[in-house]
Amino acid sequence: MAETIETRPFPPFLPKNTTVMMMGTFPPTSEKRSMEFHYPNFQNDMWRVYGLVFFDDKEHFRKGEEKAFDADKIKAFLSEAGIASCPTVLKAIREKGNASDAFLKVVEPVPLAEVLDRIPHCKHIGTTGGKATEILLSLLPEKVKLPKTGETIPFVFNGRELTLTRLPSTSRAYPLSLAKKAEAYKNFFKTCGLQTK
């Protein structure tokens, strides 16, 4: 049986005023999505983390009482804050048919140069987990040591000076409390010069 190659279902979200870009790996399968936008799985805590960091309310981006997030509200916030969202993977094979990074075979990574050209003011990249960090580092012209979770490293890409911070995964499978994840993201965004709660 031939393995199915999937292309990322959503385009990168790249506000013109972007100073920070968040990069995960690859969205979950369609039946796991609560909206048609990045980090769509209601079981993933990304938008709860954003709610806590910027509004002191983990339900801020929830769509009413639904088990779903509000994509329009999220996009409006990201646009205002200057935060981009772009997976590190363009095409992949799900070896076990699920969203696990452990069984994600990268067929084609993101065209990083093309993405960064569209956000000339971006200075900081936050990767949301180990696999995303590994993929991003594989795209750099020079070999860079994999940072530990919470660590920030400087790097140069196409003559641009940027920083890369490896953040904890917001997947429920990652063994860290929501409060601790929010604290790590808050520290990152504050370091990047964004206003947090």
Give the location of each predicted region.
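C-terminal capping/extension of enzyme domains
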Residues: 1-17, 28, 33, 40-42, ...
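Short, conserved, surface-exposed binding loops centered on an aromatic residue
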Residues: 13, 75-78, 117-118
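Residue-level preference for short coil/turn positions at secondary-structure junctions
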Residues: 16-18, 79-81, 120-121, 160
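N-terminal nucleotide-binding beta1-loop-alpha1 segment
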Residues: 22-25
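Short, surface-exposed acidic-centric catalytic microdomains
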Residues: 31, 35-104
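Secondary-structure boundary/capping signal
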Residues: 58-59, 123-124, 144
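Internal catalytic-core helix/loop-beta-alpha segment
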Residues: 80-139
